[in-house]
Amino acid sequence: MSILNSGSCMMTDTNQNMECKVDFKKGEFDLQPLQINQFGFTKTQLHKPLTRNLSNKEDTHVPKRQKVSEPYFRGETERNVKSHQDRAASIYHEAMNGASGIHKQMSLPEYSPQMGNSWEIQVPMTTRHSISETPTKPFTATTAIAGSAGSLPRNTTIGLPGPSALLKHESGKNENQVRVCLYHKHYSRWYLPFDKDDDNQLVEAYAKYFSSENRPSIFYVLQGISFGPECEYVLRRKHWWNPWAEKVMRREIVERKIDTHPGCRTVAERYEQIEASGSEELLIIPIYKINMWVLSLLLFSAGGSVLIGLWMRLSDPSFAHGMLLNLGIGSIGSFLYLLSNTWCR
């Protein structure tokens, strides 16, 4: 059965496709088989791909673009979060599975100038539980310092976070545990809890492994970690553009309250407000020790600039006054620049 529509129709058969053409003058039907090639195009469409087939009536109506609704964006956000969680889980499982009985050798730099040679840390991350179980169960990590005499490997139990802990900040309940904040090249930051029995070498080893950088020198060495109420100790990157910042060493960590609330004139007022509200907003400020050659270089340059300015002031009073002021401001600015790159980082 065929249907007429504007002088053309299509007749479908089970064996072959037939093209139905109507001649209005003769009132007859002209049935011709469609010559379809292997790509699904007719002969007319193959020679003239940009012209439409006159045997078929095409709908030229273009529908309006639908307005993107808010649930669509919400769904996209949920999918992005899901993908990030999957990536975090894959890295976590890779770290755990990479550790099925395999000893990972981690070469670390010297921690003190008194040590004559560098030492290495072996971290055989042997899991005591499968990945399908709760990931917050601890596993045993062994550290062996090869460079120091008389040291023996010791076992340390550490509770590593699961994949969900890599993406969100969760407050801990263990008073003998500290959370170290690491920077990852795929994620903004993630946390690793360490107990008071863990030393700085183990912190540095895990910082190297979980950062996926294979360059432990980009992290500062944590010295003098005091394990008290849980707070964030951050392993910061070194400034690659500042050679003076590569020479500093972190000696201790001081806890200070954040003084950013409007209306607070002193840190003590902000501390009282935080204590009254019961919230814990802590800012970890690292204290650095400047090398003596850097400090002597700054003092020498500042003193030299002042002496040159005084000499120019005595030789030409009309000209050297502005030069002395510029040199003094420059020396003070250079000193403040060094302080900003060492203490205020």
UniProtKB/Swiss-Prot annotation:
Record flagged with keyword Kinase: no
Keyword Membrane in record: yes
Top-rank lineage group of the source organism: Eukaryota
Location of the protein in the cell: Membrane
Transmembrane region(s): 292-312, 319-329
Main location: membrane
GO biological process: chromosome segregation; meiotic cell cycle; sporulation resulting in formation of a cellular spore
Keyword line: Chromosome partition, Meiosis, Membrane, Sporulation, Transmembrane, Transmembrane helix
Record's GO cellular component terms: membrane
Membrane topology: Multi-pass membrane protein
Stated role: Required for correct meiotic chromosome segregation. Appears to also have role in sporulation.
Name of protein: Meiotically up-regulated gene 97 protein
Organism: Schizosaccharomyces pombe (strain 972 / ATCC 24843)
